[in-house]
Design a protein with these regions (language model features):
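Histidine-centered divalent-metal-coordination microenvironment in nucleic-acid enzymes
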Residues: 76, 81, 118-135, 225
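Beta-rich nucleic-acid/ligand-interaction surfaces
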Residues: 116-124, 201-208
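Intrinsically disordered, low-complexity linker/loop segments enriched in Gly/Pro
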Residues: 82-104
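Catalytic or ion-translocation cores adjacent to nucleophile or general acid/base/metal-coordination motifs
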Residues: 92, 101-121, 130-191
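SsDNA-processing nucleotidyl-transfer enzymes
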Residues: 17, 23-76
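Residues forming anionic-ligand binding surfaces in small-molecule and nucleic-acid pockets
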Residues: 68-83, 158-162
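Short, small-residue-biased leader/transition segments that mark boundaries at the very start
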Residues: 1-3
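C-terminal accessory/tail domains of diverse enzymes
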Residues: 157-374
Length: 374
């Protein structure tokens, strides 16, 4: 997994949902509107004097391409609708994404889901994200293949990935979009109580898809990630959302970028992890600091297992049998361990977001959904 700190503030999923419903009266209406180009900004809106957008036509509709001010990966770009309209996932979404990678075959392009909790941080303006970066998800192999009746020109299968993902491939963008729309239609109304999947409760829809498009070996490819945003008393931020035991690392929505395997983590972790490493090396109680107390149980669960012994480091052995008078080798080992353990937490967070778990019950549930497509 890839780890990145982020420069944007950490957001509560409930605040994101509320922002998506709020009526906008300011100018520009949101941070993605085309009116941001060259805008000087004001007290509550960032300046965008150097901002430029490039017009595109996707499936007959007007869009604009811009490069993101928050560069999470190589050539990170945003493809925004000319109009300030809400995010939506439908057949048109698939056609537009495929049209984009047809025009830019060296780029990946995807869309956040159109529902709170499983969507991104901006639900109020229709947009996609793309770029020239190979995400870990691209390398995920097929786990099994299946057939979609009437879509003989489309290769279909599920891939080995923490989130439940169907991969479709075809030389025909039209055939691929139609097959994807069939999967979306089936998923929108799908229930499986055994896997706690309900498409609707109290009049609220829960099932949607995070789609990702790319060109590979001369074929169009679509990854369809099955999402569900149901909440419970035990999990008020989302049942298929990072569970509370991981919130000290990742509490926000699992959006498009995370779905593809790149961890977008809160900026606070930089200082928190630096202090955590210092306190571990000095033998100080992690629970005595505001910055590290939330990480105490987590750190204590792996320090001994990784053979990290601060006392040995201060005595000059570094815990590895060699001279380490300043403890620099131990510090380096500890820093590497922290990075690896954050990656493990991120993988667990992705597993939380998977609707069909990697258990016997989860795999049987995935098979039942595939059967519903036949």
């Amino acid at each position: 997994m890839c780890i990145r700190d982020r420069s944007k503030p950490e957001k509560d999923p409930r605040d994101i949902a509320a922002a998506g419903k709020a009526k906008k009266s300011g100018y520009p209406a949101c941070a993605l509107c085309m009116e941001n180009e060259g805008y000087a900004g004001h007290l509550t809106h960032p300046a965008r004097q150097n901002h430029r957008i490039i017009p595109l036509i996707l499936d007959g509709e007007s869009y604009y391409l811009q490069y993101s001010p928050y560069v999470y990966y190589n050539e990170h770009c945003i493809i925004l609708n000319e109009k300030h309209i809400p995010m939506v996932i439908n057949g048109g979404t698939f056609r537009k994404l495929l049209d984009f990678v047809r025009q830019f075959p060296h780029y990946t392009a995807g869309s956040n889901a159109d529902l709170p909790i499983v969507g991104g941080s901006i639900l109020s303006h229709d947009h996609f994200q793309g770029g020239g970066y190979e995400f870990p998800m691209v390398r995920a192999p097929y786990e099994k293949y299946f057939e979609i009746p009437g879509a003989e020109n489309v290769e279909a299968g599920i891939i080995r990935w923490p989130l439940s993902t169907i991969r479709l491939r075809s030389e025909s963008a039209g055939d691929l979009a139609r097959a994807a729309e069939r999967v979306l239609t089936a998923w929108r109304s799908y229930d499986d109580p055994a896997c706690f999947i309900y498409h609707e409760t109290e009049g609220k829809s829960h099932n949607t898809i995070t789609p990702i498009a790319r060109m590979r070996e001369g074929k169009f490819e679509l990854d369809l990630v099955l999402r569900n945003n149901i909440t419970t008393k035990e999990y008020p931020l989302g049942y298929f959302h990072p569970h509370p035991e991981y919130h000290h690392i990742k509490k926000e929505n699992i959006g498009l970028i995370e779905v593809m395997g790149l961890a977008v983590l809160p900026a606070r972790l930089k200082q928190e992890m630096a202090e955590l490493e210092d306190r571990i090396l000095c033998g100080q109680d992690l629970r005595e600091s505001e910055r590290t107390k939330a990480h105490a149980d987590w750190a204590e669960s792996w320090i001994a297992a990784r053979g990290i012994n601060p006392a040995q480091g201060t005595k000059g052995t570094g815990g590895n049998g060699g001279a380490d008078p300043g403890g620099s080798l131990l510090r380096k080992r500890l820093h590497g361990a922290v990075q690896e353990e954050i990656g493990i937490v991120f993988a667990k967070v992705l597993e939380c977001a998977g609707v069909f778990k990697y258990t016997k019950k989860g795999r049987e549930g995935f098979d039942r959904f595939l059967d519903s497509l036949r």
